[in-house]
């Protein structure tokens, strides 16, 4: 048996042992998640490695496609906790719900700027065409943010057009109808293999955005505080496992994303697990404010609402203040 398989088997054994020690008296808890993307990995790893059972929770993960449907299931009581896009929670709360963000799973946008081979730095984009998925999307927002960061005026210095999906944008790059676009990890690996350049990483430009969050309701916090507390303890333990057990974590990524290309799996692990997943998963108030600013034109309620309205970080703060998170990394 090769070393990677030994490490993976060891990790699975750890999960079994952890689970065996924690099942007695475990509380049942359904947890929803809204997408099959690399940003969702911490939840899957926490489940697969047995940390919910260690913390006396018998968790069933439920995939509910799309942020709005997942948030609706949360509000209906079908799933008391969800991992979902932050914007879905914000819009739901603005509409009068009691949904609240209790942790930040991914606090920026997972986009990199990909260009045709002859463009090697952002200033060369002046007068060129950038393709986005659709106007008003997070992809479009990220493209405009990047251009402004590099001193280029979107639409004026750099025309922006709608193209559609990532495959469509790659085809447009290859065909020369656009000169740049934004793609997510691990599609960045494919971009490099096709000979395109990656000249900027949004996550390294300091942008805070509540891309993916752990959310519940105020009612659940009031009626099941210990379940939420144990969930959060398991979750930060899962993040630690994610960051420190590469082979086992890659196996979970490959399983849930149904990926056979281990080079792409490693790209996702390094770029998201190691670089972008926070050890201390506090929600980002700046990131929530950015969501509010983004939707203010279509929802005037967003203008006068403070980001603190949407966040309750007490459970992460308890763990942080107790030193429990820091001890994991010693």
Task: Tell where the protein language model's regions lie, with residue ranges.
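Short, glycine-/small- and polar/acidic-enriched structural segments
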Residues: 27-175, 179-185, 198-208
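Pocket-lining segment of extracytoplasmic ligand-binding domains
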Residues: 87-88, 167-259
């Amino acid at each position: 048996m090769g070393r990677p398989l030994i490490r993976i088997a060891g990790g699975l054994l750890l999960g079994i042992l952890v689970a065996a020690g924690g099942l007695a008296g475990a509380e049942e808890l359904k947890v929803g998640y809204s997408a099959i993307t690399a940003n969702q990995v911490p939840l899957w790893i926490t489940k697969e490695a047995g940390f919910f059972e260690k913390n006396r929770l018998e968790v069933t993960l439920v995939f509910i496609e799309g942020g709005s449907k997942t948030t609706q299931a949360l509000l209906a009581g079908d799933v008391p906790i969800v991992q979902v896009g932050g914007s879905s929670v914000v819009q739901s709360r603005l509409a009068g719900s009691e949904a609240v963000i209790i942790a930040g799973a991914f606090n920026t946008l997972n986009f990199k700027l990909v260009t045709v081979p002859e463009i090697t730095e952002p200033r060369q984009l002046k007068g060129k065409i950038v393709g986005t998925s659709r106007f008003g999307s997070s992809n479009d927002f990220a493209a405009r943010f990047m251009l402004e960061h590099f001193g280029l005026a979107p639409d004026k210095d750099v025309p922006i057009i709608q193209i559609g999906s990532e495959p469509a944008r790659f085809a447009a790059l290859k065909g020369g109808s656009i000169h740049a676009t934004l793609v997510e990890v691990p599609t960045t690996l494919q971009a490099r293999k096709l000979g395109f350049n990656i000249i900027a990483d949004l996550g390294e430009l300091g942008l805070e955005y509540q891309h993916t969050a752990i959310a519940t309701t105020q009612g659940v916090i009031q009626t099941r505080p210990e379940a939420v507390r144990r969930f959060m303890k398991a979750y930060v333990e899962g993040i630690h496992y994610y960051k420190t057990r590469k082979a086992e974590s890659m196996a979970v990524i490959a399983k849930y994303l149904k990926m056979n290309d281990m080079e792409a799996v490693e790209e996702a692990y390094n770029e998201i697990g190691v670089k972008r997943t926070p050890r201390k998963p506090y929600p980002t108030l700046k990131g929530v404010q950015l969501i509010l600013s983004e939707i203010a034109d279509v929802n005037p309620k967003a203008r006068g609402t403070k980001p603190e309205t949407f966040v309750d970080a007490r459970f992460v703060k308890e763990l942080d203040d107790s030193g429990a998170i820091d001890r994991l990394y010693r």
